[in-house]
Amino acid sequence: MKQPELTVIQRAVLERAAALGLPAGARILDAPCGSGVLAAALAERGFAAVGADVDTEAAAMLGPAFSQVNLNESLPWKEQTFDAVFSTEGIEHLENHFSFLRGICRILKPGGILLLTTPNIAALRSRMRFFGSGFFGRDSRPLNEAARHPLHHIGLATFPELRYKLHMSGFRLTEVRHTHIKPISYLYAFYAPWMWVYTKLAFRKEKDPIQRKRNKEILSTLLSPSVLFGECLLLVAKKV
């Protein structure tokens, strides 16, 4: 049976992992791990990688390094178990982002790293789809209420929302990147100046001086190529 290949998103994660400075043998949790191909690739590179998912597909590839876990529930690992947690295209499927992120924070060692990817609904192409239909780019119609599925996008979030949730859950965001950009997305650059003006005006309403300073960081990221054109966000956060 042919083994699944890394997706473009997983390749971006693997490339970024190599630059995080994690030592050989570092304990990494990949959750959700899907087929297990990313956890297997991390193990091949010398990391002590394990995978977890509600689906058991990865058991065939990872063997004892796989655990069946419902990420909507309390995470089963002890405090300070992992050096890093990778969560690729997972948080948008979960019921409670805060609970998940605080659970991740609990099982990370001090200074541990969370690498997270999720669909970028703040991209210009996604914003224009929402303007026209009321639905973001990843979901062009209502979710099927008669057939609930673990892969339903029940928790899509913008970059500012994700930043807030990370900072309220024991993390400090250190990097914001994109996994990949589709050429068609650049056609929407026409709308970027209007977005710049509208966003600047909206941010002027903040009166709190501390938040105004933080909003400068948020604004800079919102207007970056990664957020304006990226298909998926790749966020790196550190446990504080």
Regions found by a protein language model. Give the residues of each.
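Conserved class I S-adenosyl-L-methionine
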Residues: 115-140
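Acceptor-substrate binding/catalytic loop of class I
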Residues: 145-161
